[in-house]
Amino acid sequence: MNRRHRIYEGKAKILYEGPEPGTYIQFFKDDATAFNAKKHEIIDGKGVLNNRISEHIFSHLGRLGIPTHFIKRINMREQLIKAVEIIPLEVVVRNVAAGSLSKRLGLEEGTPLSQSIIEFYYKNDSLDDPMVSEEHITAFGWAVPQEIEDIMQLSIRINDFLSGLFAGVNIQLIDFKMEFGRLWEDEAMRIVLADEISPDSARLWDIQTQEKMDKDRFRRDMGGLINAYQEVAKRLGIINENEPSRPNGPVLVK
């Protein structure tokens, strides 16, 4: 097998050159990081679960007409995706106070918000991804006003869908992070959802018990990260519920 050309390696994923022009292969690693990689461990099986959960979500979003970079899953750890020009912003949608919002504003974690909040963060690890305003975004040329409007409208639609999807399996969507990119098709450009949506990038709580089912289990040294991710996958119908737990990892539905 020929050695693939590596385009980019991030904290949790690697991008390789795809088989066709305008495509990449996105590989999900087992690395768990927090606080901009100041905390780092390898957790066996995490990449497999994130790949399948993100595939499940992106496939649903695509069927709803929400444009994404996702083409198809290749194997347990890899997806074929469209090559996009990533906008250097993390877009966070918050439905319930938690994490940095609770710390910044002195809110008790778990406080419901009267409306969903959309926040923008400049993607720069050396600066710890500072929060920025729409004025910062346009002033520094990261995106133009119409692109910001497109991102916000897509974020609202995605949040509405995901909130319902997770509520249907007894999970509350507290908040989640997204990235968007510019997809060029001939002379036309459109904004599409990129990166991933998984328990790595979303806060997910069990509706009844408030048990955390996301990367906060790693951030806060709670343990049980893989079990929590497996439970999310099981509720979404990705893991076969009839299969017993196995030490070699979860059994995934083809």
UniProtKB/Swiss-Prot annotation:
It is an enzyme of class 6 (ligase). One of its GO terms (biological process) is cobalamin biosynthetic process. It catalyses: 5-amino-1-(5-phospho-D-ribosyl)imidazole-4-carboxylate + L-aspartate + ATP = (2S)-2-[5-amino-1-(5-phospho-beta-D-ribosyl)imidazole-4-carboxamido]succinate + ADP + phosphate + 2 H(+). Gene3D superfamilies: ATP-grasp fold, B domain, Phosphorylase Kinase, domain 1. PROSITE patterns: SAICAR_SYNTHETASE_1. It holds the Pfam family SAICAR_synt. Keywords: ATP-binding, Ligase, Nucleotide-binding, Purine biosynthesis. Its EC number is 6.3.2.6. CDD domains: SAICAR_synt_PurC. GO terms for cellular component: cytosol. Pathway: Purine metabolism; IMP biosynthesis via de novo pathway; 5-amino-1-(5-phospho-D-ribosyl)imidazole-4-carboxamide from 5-amino-1-(5-phospho-D-ribosyl)imidazole-4-carboxylate: step 1/2. The keyword ATP-binding applies. The keyword ATP-binding applies. SUPFAM superfamilies: SAICAR synthase-like (SSF56104). One of its GO terms (molecular function) is ATP binding. Belongs to the SAICAR synthetase family. This is Phosphoribosylaminoimidazole-succinocarboxamide synthase.
